[in-house]
Amino acid sequence: MRWKRTIQLLDVHAEGEIGRVAIGGVPKIPGETIAAQLHWLNTDPKGDELRRFLCLEPRGAPIGSVNLLLPARHPDADAAFIILQPDQAHASSGSNSICVTTALLESGIVEMQEPETIVTLETAAGLVKATATCRDGRCEKVKLTMVPSFVHELDVEIDTPHWGKIKADLCYGGIFYALVDVGQINLTIEKANAAGLVQAGMILKELINRDIKVVHPEIPAISGVAYVMFRDTEADGTVRTCTTMWPGRADRSPCGTGNSANLATLHARGKAKVGDVFTSKSIIGSEFEVGLQAVTEVAGRPAVIPTITGRGFTFGLTQVALDPFDPHPGGFALTDVWGPSAGEI
């Protein structure tokens, strides 16, 4: 076979959300830090080419992410990674951290210790401590100690053409979120409403990023609202979530970074304290356990240290390749399955 590029992927999902892990063939990514490498992936044409190669058709699909395993730069880290999605490279993700931890341990890249293995992951947002419960050569569950999460602004009013004025909390949980109580758009979080939730999320994200600028005070490479997450609280205190992702799909997992951001809002409103633990449920009914481990500060702002616990499952091993005569090395996306914003890719 006349392939000019090959990348090996271990297929993993965390509570339903696919996070393929590139375990071989990853090209060298320029940059002295993981944040600098993230910036390169999002600004250099060669970085864009790599993302499109892996994430778009015919090699990719509108669901899931591809995680690039990279050499760690921090002396305390076991591995580093950056998340690639159809829109751009992202700094941090709870479900993808679970996928990466599961892949590292079950592939033997990091030696598994039973009954517990601690893996320190380096991301552009900082270090994530992953505590994996292991038995009989399998990673049964992963508890993540997430990066400090904080509120940018609560109850931001947004003028919308469909729902009038709605309020959103703009918060950081590893990336920036707009958190919206789902009742404001007259929907509930359930499978049958996935398309409507996604459409609303895409509209709101565009409106927010058009009018409001958010930048991490210590990591300028992380800026802009990445996702809109709809939320609701069930009678037993379970937080129901649906994170909407460009160009038009719903996160299948409860969303680790989104729940981290939401935990910051709960703490800011006096609804969560250190030691509290609650359940978050996704649109497909899968669950994360969310805890408030500690409080801290980020650039003088109150912040929380969340924990996210969930499960990862391997389901395949793939080798992605490029034939030198392939007319679509940069991939493509169509609105039939990629959503109404696919034409912007």
From Swiss-Prot:
Catalysed reaction(s)?
Answer: trans-4-hydroxy-L-proline = cis-4-hydroxy-D-proline
Task: Alphabetically list the UniProt keywords.
Answer: Isomerase
The UniProt record lists the keyword Transport: no
Which Pfam family, an example, fits this chain? Pro_racemase
The record's EC number reads: 5.1.1.8
Please give the Gene Ontology molecular function terms for this protein. Answer: 4-hydroxyproline epimerase activity; trans-L-3-hydroxyproline dehydratase activity
Q: Which domain of life, per UniProt?
A: Bacteria
- Catalytic residues (UniProt): S93, C255
Known function: Catalyzes the epimerization of trans-4-hydroxy-L-proline (t4LHyp) to cis-4-hydroxy-D-proline (c4DHyp). May be involved in a degradation pathway of t4LHyp. Can also catalyze the epimerization of trans-3-hydroxy-L-proline (t3LHyp) to cis-3-hydroxy-D-proline (c3DHyp) in vitro, albeit with 2-fold lower efficiency. Displays no proline racemase activity.
Q: Does the keyword Secreted apply?
A: no
Q: Say which family it is in.
A: Belongs to the proline racemase family.
What name is this protein filed under? 4-hydroxyproline 2-epimerase
Q: Which residues bind substrate?
A: Q85, G94, S95, D251, G256, T257
